Amino acid sequence: MLKIAFDKSYRHPLDEKHRFPMIKYELIPEQLIRENTCNDSNFFIPGCIEDKNVLTTHEETYYRKLCDLKLTPKEARPIGFPMSKSLIKREKLISQGTIECVSNSLKNGVSMNIAGGTHHAFRDRAEAFCMLNDQAIGANFLLENNLASKILIIDLDVHQGNGTASIFNLDNRVFTISFHGKKNYPFHKEKSDIDVEFDDDTGDIEYLKRMDAVIPNICLLYTSPSPRDRTRSRMPSSA
């Protein structure tokens, strides 16, 4: 059964002039139900995350300052949201949602988190509406609990998953692929294992063609049961 992490707090209250489209976290569940992709029974409310599961990914000093609302103005400015306890609670809920989703996926094959994908959060700093990297936290949860020996992260957001790429740059257990706009944020990009960059106005056919040129081969290689010596070499962005 498809399990979907969602809580009403995912739509955090913001000033109506704020540029972040927070309403999408309310509209997505409504659309999924409207199109009969799922029903109310598919949704679950995440529990409370344990600090130890965050600290497999994030530097402790940063995490404590974040939770205590003690980031300096310079540290908080890249987040882009007004800081509050409820915002941090929401961020932790999202990360726990991804932990529960990856656990459900081991049983059911697939799960989703309505507000997941906080891929701009680095190990020791926040960036671009992302404070805790739920993808990295979920991956490390599986690895630390011996529920997986290697993880493949495929990021299809228009923005590069720079935080995720940085966090796993030296971890051979996690392979990162990012498909993103060449000229889009972040303007200084990190290096994923594979970065596939697109020009503005790329159409569906070209996008899918380049996905098909990368993903099947990587999935076949990376899920092979035989051990292999994977180097951290990168494919060119034109892959």
Q: Model-flagged regions — what are they?
A:
Residues 235-239:
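Hydrophobic alpha-helical segments, chiefly the membrane-spanning helices
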Residues 158-159, 165-193:
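Glycine-rich phosphate/diphosphate-binding loop of Rossmann-like nucleotide-binding domains
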Residues 1-137, 141-148, 174, 181-184, ...:
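An acidic/histidine-cluster motif and surrounding catalytic segment
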Residues 192-213:
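Active-site rim loops that border cofactor/substrate pockets in soluble metabolic enzymes
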